[in-house]
């Protein structure tokens, strides 16, 4: 009986291969993987390297790639729209961090039944006055997170920081009382003395840390259990820090030329080089 059992085990492993319980079949799968998957791995690596090469499409992207725009403040000064997330990667660099705040399933009722997708909330920031929020819905979790990160980079805004009392050291808190709202959620921020820390719930605290604010008092009301509205209200609050002018900004404004006007020759030459030349027609006379 023992011999029969051994023979059956060998037969199962040899005949069924991948689906058998015998170890012989699994070993065969390993050999096959060594043959086929090794080549695939090389190809995948090549594709990734190709994707890393950024070819700018917009005028702003071409100026950033060429090094004519070196600071993100130049973009904010002229209110230029950012359409490529690689611009943020080049200007802010490795200091930009991201965190997934929440992934929630959402459903839509169709004739065939309920269609389930996943919604991701992602916050990005460098901890030095720049923060962004991205929301993306997709069939797969990984795709939703990847899309939310890209949207968060495209929505990066400057955050104005100030002092609670005397202007000693670096700015550490919000410049004044500011309120943000989304849905039923209202978030209010009040300047705090140095050393107070961020007095806030878990959700707005993470956003404020990414924005580079060290001390602030916060109060919130409404349905703060709805994390999406809570994050959006906090982000709206930080956006409004540059929404008005305080006395130190009442000085006469010095107008400067837009980067598009300064580097007109570069953009024109770039456009001419990318365009195809007209074919030369020879005379048959």
Swiss-Prot record:
Pfam families registered for this protein in UniProt: Ribosomal_S5, Ribosomal_S5_C
Segments of skewed composition (Basic residues): 35-46
Fetch the SUPFAM superfamilies from UniProt: dsRNA-binding domain-like, Ribosomal protein S5 domain 2-like
Q: What happens when the gene is disrupted?
A: Reduced DNA methylation in some of the targets of RNA-directed DNA methylation (RdDM).
Keywords annotated in UniProt: Ribonucleoprotein, Ribosomal protein, RNA-mediated gene silencing
Q: Does the keyword Zinc-finger apply?
A: no
Q: Does the keyword Ribonucleoprotein apply?
A: yes
Partners and quaternary state?
A: Interacts with MBD6.
Summarize the protein's role. Answer: Component of the ribosome, a large ribonucleoprotein complex responsible for the synthesis of proteins in the cell. The small ribosomal subunit (SSU) binds messenger RNAs (mRNAs) and translates the encoded message by selecting cognate aminoacyl-transfer RNA (tRNA) molecules. The large subunit (LSU) contains the ribosomal catalytic site termed the peptidyl transferase center (PTC), which catalyzes the formation of peptide bonds, thereby polymerizing the amino acids delivered by tRNAs into a polypeptide chain.
Q: What is this protein called?
A: Small ribosomal subunit protein uS5x
- Taxonomic source organism: Arabidopsis thaliana (Mouse-ear cress)
Query: In the UniProt record, what gene is named as encoding this protein?
Result: RPS2C
């Amino acid at each position: 009986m023992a011999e029969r059992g051994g023979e059956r085990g060998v037969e199962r492993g040899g005949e069924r291969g991948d689906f058998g319980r015998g170890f012989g079949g699994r070993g065969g799968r390993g050999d096959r993987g060594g043959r086929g998957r090794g080549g695939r791995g090389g190809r995948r690596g090549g594709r990734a390297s190709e994707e890393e090469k950024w070819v700018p499409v917009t005028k702003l992207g071409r100026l950033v790639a060429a090094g004519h725009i070196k600071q993100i403040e130049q973009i904010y000064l002229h209110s230029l729209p950012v359409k490529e997330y690689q611009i943020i990667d080049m200007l802010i660099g490795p200091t930009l961090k991201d965190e997934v705040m929440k992934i929630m399933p959402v459903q839509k009722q169709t004739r065939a039944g309920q269609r389930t997708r996943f919604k991701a909330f992602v916050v990005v920031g460098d901890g030095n006055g720049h923060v962004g929020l991205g929301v993306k819905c997709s069939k797969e979790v990984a795709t939703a997170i990847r899309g939310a990160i890209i949207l968060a980079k495209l929505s990066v805004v400057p955050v104005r920081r100030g002092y609670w009392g005397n202007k000693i050291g670096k700015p550490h808190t919000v410049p004044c009382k500011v309120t943000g709202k989304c849905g039923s959620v209202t978030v209010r921020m009040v300047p705090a003395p140095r050393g107070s820390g961020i007095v806030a719930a878990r959700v707005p605290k993470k956003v404020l840390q990414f924005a580079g604010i060290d001390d602030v008092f916060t109060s919130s009301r409404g349905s703060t259990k709805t994390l999406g509205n809570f994050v959006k209200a906090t982000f709206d609050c930080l956006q409004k820090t540059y929404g008005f002018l305080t006395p130190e900004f009442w000085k006469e404004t010095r107008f400067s030329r837009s980067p598009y006007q300064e580097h007109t020759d570069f953009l024109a030459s770039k456009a001419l080089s990318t365009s195809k030349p007209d074919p030369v027609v020879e005379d048959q006379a």
